[in-house]
From Swiss-Prot:
Matches recorded under InterPro entries: Redoxin, Thioredoxin-like_sf, Thioredoxin_domain, TPX, Tpx_CS, Tpx_Peroxidase_subfamily
Annotated HAMAP family: Tpx
Subunit-level organization: Homodimer.
Annotated catalytic residues: C60 (cysteine sulfenic acid (-soh) intermediate)
UniProt keywords, alphabetically: Antioxidant, Disulfide bond, Oxidoreductase, Peroxidase, Redox-active center
Occurrences of domain Thioredoxin (ranges): 18-166
UniProt source species: Helicobacter pylori (strain J99 / ATCC 700824)
Identification of the protein by name: Thiol peroxidase
UniProt-listed Enzyme Commission number(s): 1.11.1.24
Pfam families: Redoxin (PF08534)
GO molecular function: thioredoxin peroxidase activity
CDD domains: PRX_Atyp2cys (cd03014)
Family statement: Belongs to the peroxiredoxin family. Tpx subfamily.
Note: The active site is a conserved redox-active cysteine residue, the peroxidatic cysteine (C(P)), which makes the nucleophilic attack on the peroxide substrate. The peroxide oxidizes the C(P)-SH to cysteine sulfenic acid (C(P)-SOH), which then reacts with another cysteine residue, the resolving cysteine (C(R)), to form a disulfide bridge. The disulfide is subsequently reduced by an appropriate electron donor to complete the catalytic cycle. In this atypical 2-Cys peroxiredoxin, C(R) is present in the same subunit to form an intramolecular disulfide.
Length: 166
């Protein structure tokens, strides 16, 4: 099992770890209208799925803003940001920060994303939140890029991700 750190704590990641080449599972998440939606989207060249612990964190907000900016530049790519925040909180934060060009989804109801993508934080002060991670899926829903950020306080490798999307 993979591990990540936050300050002095080390977390075991729970759930089924996906590898590059695996078919990505389609899971139910909750949107800003409290409606259940499927993660996987049809008819897009690439799908970037970005998970983070909480949009209230400064690094998490930077990550969401970065992907919002990229979403405006790459119309053939679908961007989703997923956290365990309640959809109401997600909406308030994104509205205040001008984040509007990507899908903001919550895994709070079923934890299905965290468990099926292997990014649910295990025992510790952040238990039950999502590890900072990025998955890129191709048009068939196959994982072609995966990054789990080892230190939760750091941002993903945006340059490596953008190379995959070119």
């Amino acid at each position: 099992m993979q591990k990540v750190t936050f300050k002095e704590e080390t977390y075991q990641l729970e759930g089924k770890a996906l590898k590059v080449g695996d078919k990505a599972p389609d899971v139910k998440l909750v949107n800003g209208d409290l409606q259940e939606v499927n993660l996987l989207k049809q008819g897009v060249r690439f799908q970037v799925v970005s998970a983070l612990p909480s949009l209230t964190g400064s690094v998490c907000l930077l990550q969401a803003k970065h992907f919002n900016e990229q979403a405006g530049k790459l119309p053939s790519v679908s961007f989703s940001v997923i956290s365990m925040d309640l959809p109401f909180s997600q909406g308030q934060i994104c509205g205040a920060e001008g984040i509007k060009d990507l899908r903001i989804l919550s895994d709070f109801r079923y934890k299905a994303f965290g468990e099926n993508y292997g990014v649910l934080l295990g025992k510790g002060s952040l238990q039950g939140l999502l590890a900072r991670s990025v998955f890129v899926l191709d048009d068939k829903g196959v994982v072609i890029y995966k990054e789990i950020v080892q230190n939760i306080l750091e941002e993903p490798n945006y340059e490596a991700l953008l190379k995959v999307l070119k």
